[in-house]
């Protein structure tokens, strides 16, 4: 079989024009050169790719570690103390004086217990929804207390009123749970009279 192909090749070379033979040889050389250059170019691209991204293959199997707080930071967060009752219920001197003046104006002539109860109403309101959360805010809330409207809130409090206010401020157990008080002989508001009465002290009715 090989002998037949060899003979055929010799026959073609003998009868093929010289120009045709040269053209065929040139085409074969050109194709060989093209394949060589292509292989060289691919090798160049592959080398450059590896040099440009050297960490891709090395890092692909690495796992991303979560960020962790330092031991010092974690300890600081865990050791953060909660506020104590004393820290939560701190009052300024200005608030104490204002509460004393309200007690003096609202409970003048009342017993010491009655004065403490009036102060307790103010403090109870600071802890209830619907009221300001400061002593000043509660006392100066619109239409909340008559002494604010008529100016008697500005009178200097007597000693007993100051002591009653201080006892209410320092006591963990309030004299009353009421958030309202009124004098039934002088109160003209029907709404305040509709509130549930919890106790009566002197001339005042205390309600919720």
Swiss-Prot record:
Inducers of expression: Positively regulated by WalR. Expressed mainly during exponential growth and rapidly shut off as cells enter the stationary phase.
This protein's record includes keyword Signal: yes
Keywords: Signal
Signal peptide span: 1-26
GO molecular function, one term: hydrolase activity
Positions of region (Disordered): 52-95
Start-end of Basic and acidic residues biased regions: 71-95
Superkingdom as given in the UniProt entry: Bacteria
Pfam families given in the database record: Hydrolase_2 (PF07486)
Designated name of the protein: Uncharacterized protein YkvT
Species the sequence originates in: Bacillus subtilis (strain 168)
Native organism taxonomy: Bacteria, Bacillati, Bacillota, Bacilli, Bacillales
Gene: ykvT
């Amino acid at each position: 079989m090989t002998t037949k192909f060899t003979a055929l090749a010799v026959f073609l070379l003998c009868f093929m024009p010289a120009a045709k033979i040269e053209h065929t040889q040139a085409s074969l050389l050109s194709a060989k050169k093209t394949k060589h250059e292509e292989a060289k170019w691919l090798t160049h691209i592959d080398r450059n790719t590896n040099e440009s991204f050297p960490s891709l293959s090395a890092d692909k199997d690495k796992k991303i570690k979560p960020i962790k707080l330092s031991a010092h930071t974690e300890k600081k967060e865990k050791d953060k103390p909660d506020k104590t009752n004393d820290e939560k219920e701190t009052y300024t001197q200005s608030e104490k004086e204002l509460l004393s003046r309200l007690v003096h104006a609202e409970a003048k002539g009342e017993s010491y217990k009655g004065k403490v109860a009036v102060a307790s109403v103010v403090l109870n309101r600071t802890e209830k929804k619907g009221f300001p959360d400061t002593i000043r805010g509660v006392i100066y809330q619109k239409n909340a207390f008559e002494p604010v409207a008529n100016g008697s809130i500005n009178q200097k409090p007597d000693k007993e009123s100051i002591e009653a206010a201080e006892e209410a401020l320092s006591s963990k157990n309030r004299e009353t749970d009421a958030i309202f008080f009124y004098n039934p002989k002088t109160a003209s508001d029907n709404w305040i009279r509709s509130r549930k009465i919890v106790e009566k002290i002197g001339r005042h009715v205390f309600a919720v």
